[in-house]
């Protein structure tokens, strides 16, 4: 009798708890079902490649298969819906008219992607929106003014020459094969440390920042993998996974380096004996530190760390990829390489000194740089979350809340926009051809109010690097080890870029 009473006493609460849990599961299932039906309705006017009912297009998204994207662009020349699992979809666009409308708006960045970035870099220009973004942008823009960048030419040239000295020591025969991306990555890090942070690290020689470079690469891989893995969208599942644990450890590495840079610069400024009190330093970090000193509430310690993280990461990674791909393209196309070298010699001589004005004269080399950025854009896509409905040129509309991805790769490889898009043809960028082209056909640095703040710095770095490299070496591809793409936040070479280097003895 007593057992029966106890069973009755506990059975009802357990029954109610079970019913409550079941109701929650059913409510969540209904919510997801309605979300999927809404997405299917909104995206029904837009054809696209078939998607797996559960995985969506994850196979295509996770394989770094740019050829598959090229095939999709051929079949669907403006846009297509891309499913990430059964309940999440992005809308990919790669048509200049679509891009023009998309970039003219002020929609916020894709929130989920930038939530993934925040633990690594904080909330800086890359992932801020609204008034806070505008405040940071206005504050940092002066650091990239032409008058501030001109003195950087000598600094960049010095860092490139350090790398070339290493290559010359490695060069022992008529032709030496070198994996160039690793060296170029350290060189661009050296440049950003000097030009933006006022730090003489000698990182190309002493290897002090190798763990930082490795951490940025691995973080990029994890972020990209998580973005397109439906199961890892849930924070708890991700944090309990091996990748989640690795992500947290790598984030600590990034923050340690950032904190050291900030503290070292503060000490330098504190101990600096000013010869001219009216002279103000205009390097990036000093501008940020000055802003914080004026109003710490408007620009906090977190803001400071976020901007240093953002520019340290973005400032060297994309540049390293661009220079490496430029070298590879010129190695594959020796006739263009020779023409660039001839132009560079006629302007720079032996390259012992380089000026801003001389770099501006390198018209054919600049066209080769732009063609490389078209063929292999360093940032393959950008994304926004629509704050209000978007009406496309064909009259169809997308609702607020939809995530739109502008595929810069797709745009630059769209045969409806570019003739023979796979062919390396620098003459696409003559003044006549550029004037006849849609203004949004070529977007390596994006466009509109949120374009890349450092694009002038990046172009300067590309010109200095390629000029000095071609003056000292002839490059040819190692056809036994062709590079593969690693499409994360930056389009890197997955296993490096191997080139045959032949020293030009007249230099």
Curated annotation (Swiss-Prot):
Locations listed in the record? Endoplasmic reticulum membrane; Microsome membrane
* Keyword match Oxidoreductase: yes
Tissue distribution of the protein: Expressed in brain and aorta. In the brain, expressed in the Purkinje cells of the cerebellum, pyramidal neurons in the dentate gyrus of the hippocampus, cortical forebrain neurons and those of brain stem nuclei (at protein level). In addition to neurons, also expressed in cerebral vascular endothelial cells (at protein level). Also expressed in epithelial cells of the choroid plexus (at protein level). Hardly detectable in heart, lung, kidney and spleen.
Q: What's an example GO cellular component term for this entry?
A: endoplasmic reticulum membrane
Q: Which Pfam families match?
A: p450
Query: What is the protein's major site of localization?
Result: endoplasmic reticulum
Main EC class the enzyme belongs to: oxidoreductase
Q: Which CDD domains match?
A: CYP4B-like (cd20678)
What role does it play? A cytochrome P450 monooxygenase that selectively catalyzes the epoxidation of the last double bond of the arachidonoyl moiety of anandamide, potentially modulating endocannabinoid signaling. Has no hydroxylase activity toward various fatty acids, steroids and prostaglandins. Mechanistically, uses molecular oxygen inserting one oxygen atom into a substrate, and reducing the second into a water molecule, with two electrons provided by NADPH via cytochrome P450 reductase (CPR; NADPH-ferrihemoprotein reductase).
Name under which the protein is recorded? Cytochrome P450 4X1
Q: Which organism is it from?
A: Mus musculus
